Every structure is written in structure tokens, then in C-alpha cells.
């Protein structure tokens, strides 16, 4: 039974791993948490943690993982499950997969370095096209290089989330001059320059893949309740993922990659409703906990499916219509502090949200820490 395995969450202190910890805890499993320093000790405050280690970076966390838990499989005959929720963490672990595969059951694509291969934005866009998804025109450029045959405006992105300045490498440029100016601020040596269009919305799918990508559950889909030009929206509407053509394409991609783990797929919704594939995040996403609220706890279902060798027939649950999920301090900052709504209206919507990413009546200490650090987290 999967619950007989030690479960370890190694991630930056954030509400993302808090969702993993709560998903496991609500299923009766108290994980070990290797907490990499973040803005505030949010996830480590959860009552569901059995033991917490504090480290400064992924390298220190990896060394601790090996020294403290690297012998568990040899001593007990049962490999621990290892959960990831940060791009740099999964990228680092993927480059050490040969050292991990006999000791842990972790997110992977069958061989060392293969997850990183498809964290490369160009590679994953090409695979998406192969499997029939729409993709915006793009070029791979070295920093300072002007793309040929690409119409403006364009958007710049680091070629991989493990390289460069992540969000600080994202610039919208309306001309060659603006692109050259943006290069002065971009950290990544290799840049994806992509056609930019005004979006109607975004479409994020949360799921898991197991048994070399043969078992895939696309559990929920989220769209944003309001759009921000340069930031994700912290208020979303959650439904079942019911787009069959997209489902078929994504199942084909995940099987070809051979991915085993929890993931998120991001699409841009154009003004005419066209879905343009953006990327797959090969780790637990911030929005994953909404699937737990929909009775589909992805970390639990992934571990269970990996243990059993098959996905149970009732893994997918029907959502009765839709529900709202909220990143509380960020939504407050974006709407109340800017005067879009007042505190009274915000409190009404806060209470109506079925999923809070910080608040839980059953696990209150992270919420207390959140409130103490409200401005810092917003």
C-alpha cells in the first residue's frame, strides 16, 4: 500500500508545497518536509508534517536528503516517495536521477536529464505541434540576437525556467529597438522570442502521469476571473477538464516523454477562443490543491497509481458545475489595495471560495503566519 512508504516533500517555503503537504495529510499521511528558505515559514507550519528540516538551497537539501533518507529503501525494502513543487528543484533532481532512482520514487521521465530536455520551451513547443496543438510562432535566439521572420509585438522568455531571471526575463516588445533594450535586462543567455497576442484568458490544467506516461489523469482546468497584464490572476474558476481533443494530445505528449509525476499544463486563450499551448510544468503547481478540494488529490493519486501499477477507474471525480479558488493575500493586494473592490466585498468572496491556498480551518497555523506576513506575501 502506498501509505506504507515514507513521503518526503522537498521545496521552497511557499503555499505550493503547503498544498502537497495538506493533500497527503488529509489522506492520513504525515510527510517529512525539507524546507528551502523562502519569504516566510508557511508550509513548515502545517500540522501534517512529521519532521521538518530547514536548508538554505537545493544543493543543501539534496545532500540532506541523501544523508538522512538515502538508506531507507535498503533498510526497509520500501522506497520513499519524493515530491517536487519548484522548477529549479525538479531540474536539479532530474540531473541527479541516476543517484535517486534506486533509493526514491520521484518525478522523472525515465532517464537522467529527460525532464530538463522538455523544460526547454522550444522542445516542448515542437512536441506540442507534433501532437496537434496550436502554438504561437517563435524563435530561439541568443541574448542580443534579433529573430528573423517574426512579427511584432513579441514576448521574451528564458529558454528554461531553471536558467536566467524567470519572470524578470519576460518582456513584451513592440519593435526591434524595444527587444534590443530588453536584452540589456535579460539574464538568460538563450531566449525564446515568441509572437505576442492579447489574451482573453489563460487555461491551466492540473493532473498527474504515472507508469511511464501510460496512466494520465487531467483532473481540473482553471480560468482566471480577471486578467492582469504582467502577473497571474490569484482568483480563478475551477471545472473538470472536458476538452477531448486537447486531452488526447496531452496524453500523447506525456506518454512520449514517459513522465511520472504531478504536472500542470498552461494554455493562452486568444480573443477568438483558440487555445495556444505554452508549456508543461513537470512538478506540482500552485493550483494543484484545488484538485484536492475537488476530491482528486493529485499527490495521493500519483503515489497510489505508481504503487499499484495502474490508475483506479474512479480516480476522476465530477465537479458539480464549478467553484472558485483564491490566493488570498495576492488577490487582496490586486483588488482591495488598488481600490477595485472594498474589504466587505472581498470578505464575501473569500468566504465563498471553496479553495483557499493559504486558509484551512483544519490546518490553521499556516494561515496565522500568512496574516502576520500579509503585505510581504501580497
Residue ranges and their predicted role:
Residues 1-108, 373-376:
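ATP-binding N-terminal substructure of ATP-dependent carboxylate-amine bond-forming enzymes
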Residues 115-192, 211-213, 243-248:
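Active-site nucleotide/adenylate-binding loops and adjacent lid/helix of ATP-dependent enzymes
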Residues 304-378:
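Peripheral (often C-terminal) accessory segments that flank ATP-dependent C-N-forming ligase machineries
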Residues 270-332:
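Active-site/pore-lining binding-face segments in mid-to-C-terminal subdomains
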Residues 260-272:
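A short glycine-rich, hydrophobically flanked beta-strand micro-motif that places a catalytic Asp/Glu
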Residues 177, 195-258, 281-306:
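ATP-dependent carboxylate/phosphate-activation module, predominantly the ATP-grasp catalytic core
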Amino acid at each position: 500500500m502506498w501509505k506504507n512508504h515514507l513521503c518526503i516533500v522537498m521545496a521552497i517555503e511557499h503555499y505550493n508545497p503547503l498544498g502537497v503537504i495538506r493533500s497527503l495529510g488529509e489522506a492520513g499521511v504525515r510527510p517529512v518536509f525539507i524546507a528551502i528558505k523562502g519569504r516566510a515559514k508557511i508550509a513548515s507550519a502545517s500540522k501534517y508534517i512529521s519532521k521538518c528540516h530547514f536548508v538554505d538551497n537545493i544543493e543543501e537539501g539534496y545532500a540532506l536528503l541523501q544523508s538522512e533518507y538515502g538508506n531507507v529503501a535498503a533498510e526497509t525494502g520500501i522506497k520513499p516517495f519524493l515530491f517536487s513543487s519548484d522548477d529549479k528543484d525538479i531540474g536539479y533532481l532530474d540531473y541527479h536521477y541516476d543517484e535517486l532512482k534506486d533509493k526514491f520514487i520521484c518525478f522523472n521521465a525515465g532517464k537522467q536529464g529527460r525532464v530538463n530536455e522538455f523544460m526547454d520551451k522550444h522542445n516542448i513547443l515542437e512536441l506540442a505541434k507534433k501532437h496537434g496543438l496550436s502554438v504561437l510562432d517563435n524563435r530561439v535566439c541568443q541574448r542580443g540576437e534579433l529573430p528573423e521572420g517574426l512579427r511584432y509585438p513579441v514576448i521574451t522568455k528564458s529558454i528554461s525556467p531553471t536558467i536566467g531571471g524567470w519572470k524578470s526575463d519576460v518582456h513584451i516588445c513592440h519593435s526591434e529597438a524595444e527587444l534590443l533594450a530588453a536584452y540589456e535586462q535579460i539574464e538568460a543567455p538563450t531566449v525564446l522570442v515568441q509572437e505576442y497576442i492579447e489574451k482573453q484568458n489563460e487555461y491551466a490544467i492540473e493532473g498527474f502521469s504515472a507508469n511511464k506516461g501510460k496512466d494520465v489523469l487531467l483532473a481540473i482546468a482553471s480560468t482566471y476571473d480577471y486578467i492582469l497584464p504582467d502577473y497571474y490572476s490569484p482568483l480563478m474558476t475551477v471545472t473538470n477538464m472536458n476538452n477531448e481533443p486537447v486531452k488526447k494530445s496531452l496524453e500523447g505528449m506525456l506518454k512520449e516523454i514517459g513522465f511520472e509525476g504531478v504536472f500542470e499544463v498552461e494554455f493562452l486563450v486568444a480573443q477568438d477562443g483558440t487555445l495556444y499551448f505554452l508549456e508543461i510544468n513537470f512538478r506540482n503547481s500552485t493550483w494543484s490543491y484545488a484538485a484536492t478540494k475537488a476530491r482528486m488529490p493529485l499527490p495521493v493519486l500519483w503515489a497510489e497509481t505508481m504503487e499499484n501499477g495502474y490508475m483506479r477507474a474512479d480516480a476522476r471525480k465530477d465537479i458539480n458545475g464549478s467553484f472558485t479558488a483564491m490566493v488570498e493575500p495576492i488577490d487582496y493586494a490586486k483588488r482591495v489595495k488598488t481600490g477595485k473592490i472594498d474589504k466587505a466585498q472581498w470578505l464575501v468572496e473569500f468566504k465563498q471560495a471553496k479553495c483557499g491556498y493559504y486558509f484551512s480551518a483544519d490546518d490553521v497555523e499556516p494561515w496565522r503566519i500568512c496574516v502576520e506576513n500579509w503585505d510581504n506575501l501580497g
